[in-house]
């Protein structure tokens, strides 16, 4: 059952990433049609922009992310129990030892970052280290180490980059279309019904694609959380530890310092005040759903 769930989550992520590339091509083609009367040119331009965004974000330094989240690097002497648990989980997962950081915050939270296992890092709050027992802390760190092993940070970064690229192209396309006047619209009105349909489709694509891209990005983030929960159980062989850890996380207060959208998606638990919004707009699946999935393993 465990391996079945892991495989299912991986398949869903592949489907969502494919949907992202389709969105990128559609928005590029729409912009190309409106601005240069060329679907191909627009689609190619969109893919190039998406690739540039993805590569530039993937190679951002770990220290930058940790600095944004006020995390301080530690050694084994600073927090031996925490350090050794990270060491043990990395050994079981067969990845290099990540750097270890602590965030001075009373909330219960943790996250991992790094574009590959070779330059990864794990951070936990002081609140988490204080409240969790050893089994629960192993489950949380197993979750974060699984993100590293599964290259989730890279996938999430690509998702953020593609969403940003879609939004950028939509913004540029929309502004240039209006600045260029009604030439494209007049041409289509003087053409035929098909041209008018394509004009409407292209304009709607420019308007709706950014929203669709954000929804796909958030869906990828939620799928990676489910996968990391299941992978943590695979590493620790202790589903009860993961369940108890999630139960404690559900009662955590928000982080005391501001957390930006990109960083929020990295944490094991939503670090900001939980708003009563649709699950579609959440970076994390409901903890109740995560616990329920673990119970059925």
Swiss-Prot record:
It is found in: Cell membrane. One of its GO terms (molecular function) is metalloendopeptidase activity. NCBIfam families: PRK04897.1. It holds the Pfam family Peptidase_M48. Belongs to the peptidase M48B family. InterPro entries: HtpX_protease, Pept_M48_protease_HtpX, Peptidase_M48. One of its GO terms (biological process) is proteolysis. It is a multi-pass membrane protein. It is an enzyme of class 3 (hydrolase). One of its GO terms (cellular component) is plasma membrane. The chain crosses the membrane at residues 14-34, 39-59, 158-178, 193-213. It comes from Streptococcus equi subsp. zooepidemicus (strain MGCS10565). The active site is at residue 144. The keyword Transmembrane applies. Gene3D superfamilies: Metalloproteases ('zincins'), catalytic domain (3.30.2010.10). The keyword Endoplasmic reticulum does not apply. Binds 1 zinc ion per subunit. This is Protease HtpX homolog. Its cofactor is Zn(2+). Its EC number is 3.4.24.-. Zn(2+) binds at residues 143, 147, 225. Its main location: membrane.
